[in-house]
Curated annotation (Swiss-Prot):
SMART domains associated with the record: S4
Protein name: Tyrosine--tRNA ligase
GO cellular component: cytosol
Species: Streptococcus gordonii (strain Challis / ATCC 35105 / BCRC 15272 / CH1 / DL1 / V288)
GO biological process: tyrosyl-tRNA aminoacylation
Primary location class: cytoplasm
Transmembrane stretches, start-end: none
InterPro entries in UniProt: aa-tRNA-synth_I_CS, aa-tRNA-synth_Ic, Rossmann-like_a/b/a_fold, S4_RNA-bd, S4_RNA-bd_sf, SYY-like_C, Tyr-tRNA-ligase, Tyr-tRNA-ligase_bac-type
Length: 418
């Protein structure tokens, strides 16, 4: 199957410039292309992964990727479909974020093997060398204000206000495409569908300044069940950095996707063949309660981002927590699996009697409720059911001398730390 057809079949092409011309270029030989990543945080997230994996698919088809990290544009801020002006970050902060993002990209694209090995570029390298006057003369004169105002990302901000800084962002992104074309022969840019206006600024600059044709492919913005896209600004980001979103949390995210999304996400986020995914679909629809699609999706993406060992650890944490086998997990694994649950720092003066502690730690609201829960067998300490009202926590309950896990009922966890 032609790579363009595969991208379409996987639902990875939202919009493109001249499809026939782009398809022909991809058929005739190796195409150099790029995707840009602005350092707006110290990590990329699942919203970025769609474009990254699309880039990797093209690389596997023999084409050459350039990963552009926006050391310059990250200092400015992209206004695309944001309700308010982005906060400007210090140069030092952005430089740190650039390094973090470069490290993540290095694990998802092949930067070492073959004639089409990926290359990393930073647009600060060329923006730091051009003066404001030269930029206005050599770049700005090719863009009319009417053209810039016509962009949807700008229109949506006119009423509430947009700074010249953000207004000029599209020209900067256009200049990135121009520079990469001149230096590396790049003729294709890949990005999210909210970037269409900025991306076509690049094809416009290529056409007007160099009389060359550039192409654009936008990938769809992936939304959650409520219709929100995955992103930092939206507050529902699943980060690629394990310190921000643990492999276990990422595993749980994929395990909890809706049935209607599971097969679609297999096409977008995994490298399983379309034939394999079709077979999974048939089995999944025959027995949706077994959640086969979600299990395979979680396995494939966690392994892709964090590695096989992290996947096996996430799977083990899931199985042990489900069974209530707290003592089968290390404190490191427990911290990963129980991150985000209520946490209470035990004080030296605290009464460690189970009834008093349940109230002090906020597990229940009253001693009466605590006594009822204990007597009814609803309270567990490190997986062991406690029904003795006089039970008092001891050093034996401190796992690795760091924490104790309290469970109320089947699923409500609380962590005591020392």
């Amino acid at each position: 199957m032609h790579i363009f057809d595969e991208l379409k079949e996987r639902g990875l092409i939202f919009q493109t410039t001249d499809e026939e011309a782009l398809r022909q270029e991809l058929e005739e030989g190796q195409v150099s292309y790029y995707t840009g990543y602005d350092p707006t945080a110290d990590s990329l997230h699942l919203g970025h992964l769609v474009a990254i994996l699309t880039s990797r698919r093209l690389q596997l088809a023999g084409h050459k990727p350039y990963a552009l990290v926006g050391g310059a544009t990250g200092l400015i801020g992209d206004p695309s479909f944001k309700d308010a002006e982005r906060s400007l970050q210090t140069k030092e902060t952005v430089e740190g974020w650039v390094k973090s993002i470069q490290g993540q990209l290095a694990g998802l694209l092949d930067f070492e093997n073959g004639q089409n090995k990926a290359e990393m570029v930073n647009n600060y390298d060329w923006f730091s060398d051009i003066s404001f006057i030269d930029f206005l003369r050599d770049v700005g004169k090719y863009f009319t204000v009417n053209y810039m105002m016509s962009k949807e990302s700008v229109k949506k901000r006119i009423e509430t206000g947009i700074s010249y800084t953000e207004f000029a962002y599209q020209i900067m992104q256009g200049y990135d495409f121009f520079i990469l074309n001149q230096k590396h022969g790049v003729t294709l840019q890949i990005g999210g569908s909210d970037q269409w206006g900025n991306m076509t600024a690049g094809t416009e600059l290529l056409r007007r300044k160099a009389d060359k044709t550039g192409h654009v492919i936008t990938v769809p913005l992936i939304t959650d069940a409520s219709g929100k896209k995955f992103g930092k600004s939206e507050g529902n980001a699943v980060w690629l950095n394990a310190d921000k979103t643990s492999p276990y949390e990422m595993y749980q995210f994929w395990m909890n996707v809706m049935d209607d999304d599971a097969v679609r996400f297999l096409k977008i986020f995994t490298f399983l063949s379309l034939d394999e995914i079709e077979e999974i679909r048939k089995q999944f629809e025959a027995a949706p309660h077994e959640r086969l699609a979600q299990k395979i999706l979680a396995r494939e993406v966690v392994t892709l981002v964090h590695g096989e060992k992290a996947y096996q650890e996430a799977l083990n944490i899931t199985e042990q927590l489900f069974a209530g086998n707290i003592k089968n997990l290390s404190v490191k694994e427990l911290k990963q699996g129980l991150r985000g649950v209520p946490n209470y720092q035990v004080q030296a003066e605290d009464n460690l009697n189970i009834v008093d502690l349940l109230v002090t730690a906020g597990v229940v609201n009253s001693k009466r409720q605590a006594r009822e829960d204990v007597q009814n067998g609803a309270i567990y300490v490190n997986g062991d059911r406690i029904q003795d009202l006089d039970y008092t926590l001891s050093d034996a309950d401190k796992l690795e001398n760091e924490l104790t896990v309290i469970r109320r009922g089947k699923k409500k966890y609380f962590v005591l730390t020392y």
